[in-house]
Amino acid sequence: MDTLTRFLPEHLQQNQLPEALGGVLLSVVSACTEINAKVRLGALAGVLGMAGTGNIQGEDQKKLDVIANNIMIDTLKANPAVAGLASEEEDTFVSAGENGRYLVLFDPLDGSSNIDVNISVGTIFSILAKPEGALATESFLQTGRQQLAAGYVLYGPQTQLVFTFGHGVYVFTLNAENEFVLTKENPKVPESTKEFAINMSNRRHWLPPVQQYVDELLAGETGTRGKNYNMRWVASMVAEIHRILMRGGVFMYLQDKRDPSKPGKLRLMYEANPMALILEQAGASASNAYQAMLDIQPESLHQRVAVIMGSSEEVDYLNRLHSK
């Protein structure tokens, strides 16, 4: 089986991609390998619990949020090809290599609310080309279609790296020697599914299209959809999307009635766009209920967005309910 270091040069050459772009991916992987070691030790390393600080989103930070964020920033700033970074945990962008050609955006520890109870978490990342001119916030505000690469590392029962350069999706598993080994090429998400993922505790806040959709799913084979569905909910986007990538399903985190000014909870740049690129490469769909996720023009670094992702039959159906 190919290791990442053997696979990557050949993949870059086959698809006429710059070696420096592969180097940025390797920097991300190096950082994630270090984060993995911290996650694995947990309480033994004293890294669990709250940090006593908050991020730009107004969310309380866990110790591992801060640790993972610092590891990502320090590792990526050491790569001269990286011009700038944007993190879910930082107020604004971070400048890096003066002559760098790439921008990296990331959620250093997605699902960190689960870390103290030993449920899977992960790191999500996106790589963009740096536009000409001085680095500014606007440099990062590119659509998801402009991503050069996207991926995530899942810290679960196995530690797995999933990424795409826009030429298929590849899954690597970390072995005992701390090397990522290719274990799956080009997974495909089935068009139809019998699984859905949503936080049912928010049901009373949902908008009518979501209420109708979930009611139809719960009606089972005697309802309008004509089949029985199972619900899943981990409260860790990386874990939810990885399950969908491996066996299908649909994941939803949508706008609701609690705050009409807030389109959703998840971040477009750090979470939705990278996951959308991976899923589209695997034959799935992703939208904000009204347009394809990858076509949304971002207006700010920390922009939130409604999310529907997964098996295209379900995404398309829920999109149609929103358009009525």
Swiss-Prot record:
InterPro entries: FBPase_C_dom, FBPase_class-1, FBPase_N, FBPtase. Its EC number is 3.1.3.11. GO terms for molecular function: fructose 1,6-bisphosphate 1-phosphatase activity; magnesium ion binding. Substrate binds at D110, G111, S112, S113, N199, K265. It comes from the Bacteria. Keywords: Carbohydrate metabolism, Cytoplasm, Hydrolase, Magnesium, Metal-binding. Pathway: Carbohydrate biosynthesis; gluconeogenesis. Its cofactor is Mg(2+). Pfam families: FBPase, FBPase_C. This is Fructose-1,6-bisphosphatase class 1. The gene is fbp.
